[in-house]
């Protein structure tokens, strides 16, 4: 088989980078594939912390497989085409490892596809190492642990699967770190928003979902102080409005998540605010509302929006 590119979604978070990096190593060493990990964007500050901590070089960024002379790819941490490579419809998808809903996805040929309702794609990749009796290098264990911590907010998110606790313990042992101490350091690294412009802030961790003909952008930022983020509301709303016009989104929903108290403030703009309000049974005041206990876009925001939009 010719060269295969392995990558996570656009605007990659820690799980996207970690799972793709680890899967590329697995593909080369267990499946004997000519696999290269790449990324669909630069690592965010949280991911950069993990990469630096474990001495791993960030994957190079690509936009097109064809431009790389590659026609076969493997996706991790996503499957929806609008979240993937620009020419994803023109290449062969050899495999997918994911933990999200399956939507807006089809292939011309059969493929290897593993989708599980667990806390992270990294959790699945780690299990695949064990199934193939492949030793997990320390730095890869550290990255996989980071992906799991990031996606589950240190195992506090409702997306956390009962098996994720054991996975986290095993990976922490392999990586040589204290789970709680390293976990908090990692999460705090991702809350430094002061250096970000508003345009950067709303794009740190953002995904587009096609909901009944509407392109709904759902972004999330982590913080230890929601009020501090809302001090920038006017400028954030300007950035959101610009993105709506430029990218053609019908709606933009920003989750401002307090990682300490496990709550979120929802800031939303667009043409379907009635559906956003109905999704969460709240009333937007000055374009935002409090959503207690909400920390997961995948489980506590997207399904509710999907139902409300009738998608």
UniProtKB/Swiss-Prot annotation:
GO terms for molecular function: inorganic diphosphate phosphatase activity; manganese ion binding. InterPro entries: DDH_dom, DHH_sf, DHHA2, DHHA2_dom_sf, Mn-dep_inorganic_PyrPase, Oligoribo/pAp-PDE_c-di-AMP_PDE. Keywords: Cytoplasm, Hydrolase, Manganese, Metal-binding. Its cofactor is Mn(2+). Mn(2+) 2 binds at residues 15, 77, 99, 151. It catalyses: diphosphate + H2O = 2 phosphate + H(+). Binds 2 manganese ions per subunit. Its main location: cytoplasm. Its EC number is 3.6.1.1. This is Probable manganese-dependent inorganic pyrophosphatase. The gene is ppaC.
């Amino acid at each position: 088989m010719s060269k295969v590119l392995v990558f996570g979604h656009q605007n990659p978070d820690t799980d996207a980078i970690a799972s793709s990096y680890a899967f590329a190593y697995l593909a080369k060493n267990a499946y004997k594939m000519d696999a290269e990990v790449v990324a669909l964007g630069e690592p965010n500050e949280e991911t950069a912390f993990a990469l630096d901590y474990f001495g791993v070089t960030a994957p190079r960024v690509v936009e097109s497989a064809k431009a790389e002379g590659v026609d076969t790819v493997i996706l991790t941490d996503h499957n929806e085409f609008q979240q993937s490579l620009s020419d994803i419809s023109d290449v062969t998808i050899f495999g997918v490892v994911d933990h999200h809903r399956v939507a807006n996805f089809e292939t011309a040929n059969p493929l290897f596809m593993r989708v599980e309702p667990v806390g992270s794609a990294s959790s699945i990749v780690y299990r695949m190492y064990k199934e193939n009796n492949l030793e997990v290098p320390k730095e890869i264990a550290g990255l996989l642990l980071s992906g799991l911590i990031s996606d589950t907010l240190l195992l506090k998110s409702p997306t956390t699967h009962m098996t994720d606790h054991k996975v986290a313990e095993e990976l922490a042992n392999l990586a040589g770190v204290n789970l709680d101490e390293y976990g908090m350091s990692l999460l705090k690294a991702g809350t430094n928003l002061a250096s970000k412009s508003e345009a950067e802030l709303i794009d740190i961790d953002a995904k587009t979902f096609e909901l009944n003909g509407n392109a709904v952008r759902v972004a999330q930022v982590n913080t230890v102080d929601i009020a501090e983020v809302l001090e920038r509301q006017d400028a954030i709303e300007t950035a959101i409005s610009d993105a709506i016009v430029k990218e053609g989104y019908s709606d933009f929903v920003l989750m401002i998540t307090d990682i300490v108290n496990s709550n979120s403030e929802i800031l939303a703009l667009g043409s379907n605010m009635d559906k956003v309000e109905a999704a969460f049974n709240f009333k937007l005041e000055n374009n935002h509302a409090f959503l207690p206990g909400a920390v997961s876009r995948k489980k506590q925001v997207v399904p509710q929006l999907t139902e409300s939009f009738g998608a």
